[in-house]
Amino acid sequence: VQTCALPIYHEGEQVGLPSLEEYNAQVRNGIPLSKDFYLRRFPVAYQFRGFHAVVMGKAKAAFILARLFNDKALRDIATRQVEYILGYNPFAMSTVYGDGYDYPPLYGAYAGNVVGAVPVGIETFENEDEPYFPIQNNCTYKEIWTHTTARLMWCVAELFK
């Protein structure tokens, strides 16, 4: 079998298919709570995708529950998730194209940068549990996804209810 060396296009490309070792490494890079339990700031992910869809899905659920139970604290938690996307994050940068003054360029293969578009989102580097959102434009985390944009709009609508 002959192999050829190809360039690496993103940090997770060499990791390969999901494995139990990889899963365990990501879990153990969380904050240890005891010998067998860890708290992660980011979900375990095999392909190192961004997490805006996860954040917005949970924020929408929190908004709905806050409204049902008339719970201001829960509504504030949901609002903070929206703020995370809009710039209250470790990079102090809105990830929405055109929002604020320091937003990143996004990856749109055909449409280019679309004002108001939301990317896949802030991710982690390989098996770490630290936020990672490099400036280079890459489809792994800066690709425009319609469902992340729609979820943000869905959550922003909750702010006006």
Features from the language model and the residues they span:
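Aromatic (Trp/Tyr) and acidic
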Residues: 1, 7-161
